[in-house]
Amino acid sequence: MKKTILSLTMLLLASAGFAQCGKNAGYEVKAENAYTNYNVRYASNPKDAKNYDTKRLRGEFAIEKVMVPGQVNWTYTMFDRFLIGGAVPTATPLKLTSIAPLYTEKPNDQKNLLDNRELGIINVGGEGIVTVDGKNYTLGFQEALYVGRGAKDITVASKDAAKPAHFYMNSAAAHKSYPTKKVTLKEANNIKAGSLKESNDRVIHQLIIDGVAGVRTCQLQMGVTELKEGAVWNTMPAHTHLRRMETYFYYNVPEGQKILHVMGEPQETRPIWLNNEEAVIAPEWSIHCAAGTSNYTFIWGMAGENLIYNDMQVVKIPELK
């Protein structure tokens, strides 16, 4: 009888653990304040990930809620402690505050979002203003702002509430403070890649890259890739980079169209369908490429152990499965 009770108790405890694990696997959104929400995604093993069904795969890697009017939404992934976020200020400016997973109640711990972090912001909406410790930076469409570690008071606002700014944000851990710097598309390192014949004619705009346009970063890299009309594939041939993780944020996706994002190990690929203004996490072990039912634009953001943009393991197209 005692053995039976003990077995039942252990089973109940295990079930409770699974329930909690499910909550923490990206399914539970928590409120930090009246307008800021966040969720946490834990790192995963490729041996496990290849067995995920569609719901679990999306729960771990897809980020559907990025841009919501009047809100700041963050996803905190344990892959390189990376933050993926969106802010859409309307009539009222929004302050970028820290979130619970980034601080404790201990003295001298991180109280401001960038006490131990750096931040990249790219605007994909109407004209907006980012204020960093009292200094205003106006960001037009596809203009970027790098904000260095130690900035305390950061707010975002739209110039016209009827045409609000859509600020897409990435943040990574930082060991040093570098100056805040705005970067326009003209100042970016603009690279033509692919061809229409290969269905991947595109322009890569390197915006927040260490050394580009006078920007210095600790580990954060961000940029925009625009596909030309008639092109549908991005990042093909595909690649991985074991020294960095990456995220993609898709936008300029026409109404009624979708993105078929491909992830996983090169011989164990899996599809994730995404809509306009949705994002996806790519672990260091995963390829990250996509085809759209129309051309589109996306923002890539990376963080990891080095700053060499071309440090990657290219996968030959015939090797993909």
Predicted regions and their residues:
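Conserved metal-binding segment of the jelly-roll/cupin
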Residues: 139-159, 273-294, 301-303
